[in-house]
């Protein structure tokens, strides 16, 4: 997909008329899944004005999850053109895939790395996230296609691979690398893998997966220094490596906006606190979507954007709001992970320990449920579901998705949910 490189005025002056309050020109900052889906949704809901898309990597939009899940089996990115049929060249009037935004000015006006100054009625910030790499660390990260190529080149049978962090990415790469014959050690500072995401009680049940997959997991192992040849722990021990991967999280790519937007619109990790339609409060003509947006959910409260499902579904909410189209029900956060020979599907936002368990961890499929007080039609013995983790239960994913993405809270029959002989869909009610 070629990137246009003209310097004509943007947007042109001969734009079609639009109803009051509806933009005639839009700049989408970001050419990943959220940006591509935003362009698609705008056109699908009738936007006929001038559309500009700005990217950073110089590549057409691609899906990021396969970078880790299929690191050694997929040699090139999964292009969204092939996967979802998204062709930016046919959707947008201008596509600049290697000219990222560097500043946002009132108007709004977007300044780019090449020196362009692009004005528009609406700017949609879909600029994604960046992997966390603490100052002084010398390690690979995995976020882009270029990162994946470097990591793929460094992994080899018998080679020593040290992964710092046992979160989603760390676990997936540990399994892939061990399966390819690498000598894998995973260093996790917390008391269990995925402790921040699922809690220590649930994470403890994932510990045996590492040894079964051929990887060493070392808990309570905080990294003090990270170099290309290994990791020095806080205890002073040195863990040698041929490849070191830092998998300690990601943060919204909003650093370039700090001087442009008021401080109160940022949450503690740098996401933008938007309304249900993605609008940034107090900043006319600016909306945000995907990893950079923290949006309200009618059941879950504030939902951070660092989920693949946010990049896939939330652009539709933003486009509808921008164009004055009737809103659709909000999607709940969803994460799918294939790690260490197991499938995990997480819906919602877990907090604390699960209220209900289904099945027995370590003995076939199992699930954990996080609930709150029943409301809006709840009955005795039921509760509102705030999160569900399904482990090796692909047949239940559809039922949980339907319950979470309905018009109101999902209710769980607590007794039926704990009984694995009862179909899960019969324990859930939207």
Residue ranges and their predicted role:
Residues 1-27, 86, 90-160, 234, ...:
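FAD-binding core/adjacent interface of flavoenzyme oxidoreductases
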Residues 9, 21-25, 294-398:
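Mid-to-C-terminal Rossmann-like scaffold of FAD/NAD(P)H-dependent oxidoreductases
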Residues 12-93, 176-197, 399:
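Beta1-alpha1 glycine-rich phosphate/pyrophosphate-binding loop at the start
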Residues 32-33, 58, 131, 146, ...:
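Residue-level detector of alpha-helix initiation sites
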Residues 83-95, 206-217:
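Helical element adjacent to the flavin cofactor pocket in flavoenzyme catalytic cores
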Residues 137-159, 230-232, 238-311:
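FAD-site-proximal beta/loop scaffold in flavoenzymes
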Residues 160, 169-223, 331-336:
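Rossmann-like dinucleotide-binding cores of NAD(P)H-dependent redox enzymes
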Residues 237-268, 342-430:
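C-terminal catalytic lobe of FAD-dependent flavoproteins
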């Amino acid at each position: 997909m070629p990137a246009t490189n003209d310097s004509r005025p943007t947007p042109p002056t001969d734009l079609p008329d639009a109803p009051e309050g509806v933009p005639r020109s839009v700049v989408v900052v970001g050419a990943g899944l959220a940006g591509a889906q935003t362009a698609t949704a705008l056109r699908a809901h009738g936007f006929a004005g001038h559309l500009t898309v700005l990217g950073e990597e110089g590549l057409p939009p691609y899906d990021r999850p396969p970078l880790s899940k299929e690191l050694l089996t997929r040699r090139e990115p999964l292009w969204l053109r092939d996967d979802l049929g998204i062709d930016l060249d046919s959707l947008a009037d201008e596509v600049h895939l290697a000219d990222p935004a560097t500043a946002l000015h009132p108007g709004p006006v977007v300044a780019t790395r090449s020196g362009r100054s692009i004005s528009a009625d609406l700017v949609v910030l879909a600029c994604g996230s960046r992997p966390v790499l603490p100052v002084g660390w010398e390690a690979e990260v995995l976020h882009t296609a270029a990162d994946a190529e470097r990591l793929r080149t460094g992994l080899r049978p018998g080679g020593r691979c040290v992964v710092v962090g046992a979160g989603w990415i760390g676990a997936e790469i540990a399994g892939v690398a061990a399966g390819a014959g690498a000598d894998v050690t995973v260093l996790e500072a917390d008391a269990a893998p995925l402790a921040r995401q699922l809690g220590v009680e649930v994470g403890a049940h994932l510990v045996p997966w590492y040894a079964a997959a051929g990887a060493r997991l070392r808990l309570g192992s905080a990294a003090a220094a990270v170099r290309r040849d290994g990791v020095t722990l806080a205890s002073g021990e040195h863990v040698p490596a041929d490849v070191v991967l830092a998998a300690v999280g990601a943060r919204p790519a909003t650093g370039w906006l700090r001087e442009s937007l008021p401080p109160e619109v940022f949450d503690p990790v740098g996401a933008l606190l938007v309304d249900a339609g993605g609008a940034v409060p107090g900043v006319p003509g600016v909306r945000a979507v995907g990893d950079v947006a923290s949006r309200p959910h009618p059941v879950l409260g504030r939902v951070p954007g660092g989920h693949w499902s946010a990049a896939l579904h939330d652009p539709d909410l933003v486009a509808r709001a921008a164009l004055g189209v009737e809103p659709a029900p909000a999607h709940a956060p969803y994460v799918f992970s294939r790690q260490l020979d197991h499938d995990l599907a997480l819906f919602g936002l877990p907090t604390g320990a699960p209220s209900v368990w289904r099945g027995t961890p370590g003995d076939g499929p199992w699930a954990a449920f996080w609930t709150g007080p029943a409301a809006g039609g709840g009955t005795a013995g039921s509760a509102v579901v705030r999160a569900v983790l399904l482990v090796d239960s692909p047949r239940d994913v559809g039922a949980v998705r339907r319950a979470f993405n309905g018009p109101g809270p999902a209710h769980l029959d607590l007794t039926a949910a704990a009984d694995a002989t009862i179909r899960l869909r019969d324990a859930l009610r939207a």
